């Protein structure tokens, strides 16, 4: 993708675009990593476990976290939390959302490591794994999410997961419904396994105003508690993310075709939906990939370009006529909020991180 003319972002470190298409039709990611480490001091969690230089982390005065935890140290979306209230134990929790995992891949690359190296190191400590997510990005795509939703409604799904939900937004064009971002949820949000199939390209477009990629689906496997612990053990044993994902998917769900020329109602005799069979066949070839990026500052810039730049251009032209620097005055009198100050601090730290590399 060509850079926008005049963009300063190619000169910034640590700001890889989140909209660059991957060459692979299928790729596998670790997309959430939440690990509790007991009886280890904060500095050791940061420098020995995460292997992030202490000076790059912001040690907070305790910020609200999740599930009885407070944030005590942070670098962008990589967070270290301390238990509070009923969750008391001696130790800390590492929390990396999807964005945090992409942030952390910068440090993995800097340390010439992989996710397997990190997980192996973590397992040398007394740990628990509240949650870990695996994600398959499908850019072919093999599946149509709206079609999966229709099949689910029609009962053409065999699954051991009891709770099913779906969301399909769209619009009518010439009396034909066209999807603009469908999602299918199998399993409850509190269960040890939840599968989520959704149109990632539409989600990114709605959230950030990025270029719409209609051919980008994401299939997430969200593991919690005992199953999350087992997943980490299996990842270290076989070092095969896609193989593990395929094994879980094959054991939990199967999308079906209505049999022709048969009156049977026994789903186990229904043939497998061809597109699902093709995905299961090819997903076993996928290797774990890393997509290191720090997208927060990039998103601000994209928002400025799309929504603010036209108005700035207007007042810049008016200023030329009136001999007034409207834009300069705006900048001089503006004040950053807490989030923007954090973005600036992260940017400064990112430059220092780049200098180390």
Task: Give the label of every model feature segment.
Residues 1-295, 303-357:
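Structured, helix-rich domain cores that form ligand/interaction pockets
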């Amino acid at each position: 993708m060509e850079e926008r003319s005049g963009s300063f972002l190619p000169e910034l470190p640590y700001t890889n675009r989140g909209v660059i298409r991957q060459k692979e039709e299928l790729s596998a990611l670790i997309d959430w990593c939440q690990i509790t480490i007991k009886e280890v001091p904060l500095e050791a969690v940061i420098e020995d476990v995460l292997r992030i230089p202490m000076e790059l982390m912001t040690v907070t005065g305790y910020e609200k976290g999740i599930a009885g935890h407070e944030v005590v140290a942070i670098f962008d979306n990589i967070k270290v939390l301390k238990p509070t209230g009923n969750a008391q134990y001696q130790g800390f929790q590492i929390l990396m959302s999807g964005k945090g995992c992409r942030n952390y891949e910068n440090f993995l690359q800097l340390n010439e490591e992989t996710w397997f190296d990190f997980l192996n190191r973590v397992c040398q400590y007394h740990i628990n794994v509240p949650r870990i997510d695996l994600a398959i990005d499908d850019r072919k795509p093999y599946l149509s999410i709206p079609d999966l939703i229709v099949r689910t409604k029609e009962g053409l799904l065999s699954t051991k997961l009891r709770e099913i939900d779906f969301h399909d937004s769209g619009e009518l064009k010439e009396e034909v419904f066209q999807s603009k971002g469908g999602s299918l949820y199998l399993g409850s949000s509190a269960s040890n396994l939840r599968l989520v199939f959704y149109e990632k390209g539409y989600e990114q477009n709605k959230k950030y105003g990025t270029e719409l990629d209609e051919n980008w689906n994401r299939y997430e496997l969200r593991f919690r508690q005992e199953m999350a612990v087992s997943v980490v053990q299996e990842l270290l044993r076989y070092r095969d993310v896609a193989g593990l994902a395929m094994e879980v998917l094959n054991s939990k769900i199967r999308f079906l075709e209505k049999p022709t020329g048969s009156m049977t109602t026994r789903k186990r005799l229904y043939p497998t939906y061809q597109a699902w069979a093709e995905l299961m066949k090819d997903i076993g070839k996928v290797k774990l990939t890393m997509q290191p990026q720090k997208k927060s500052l990039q998103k601000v810039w994209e928002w400025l370009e799309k929504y603010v730049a036209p108005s700035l251009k207007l007042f810049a032209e008016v200023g030329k006529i009136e001999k007034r620097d409207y834009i300069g005055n705006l900048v001089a009198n503006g004040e950053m909020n807490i989030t923007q100050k954090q973005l600036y601090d992260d940017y400064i730290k990112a430059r220092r991180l780049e200098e180390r590399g």
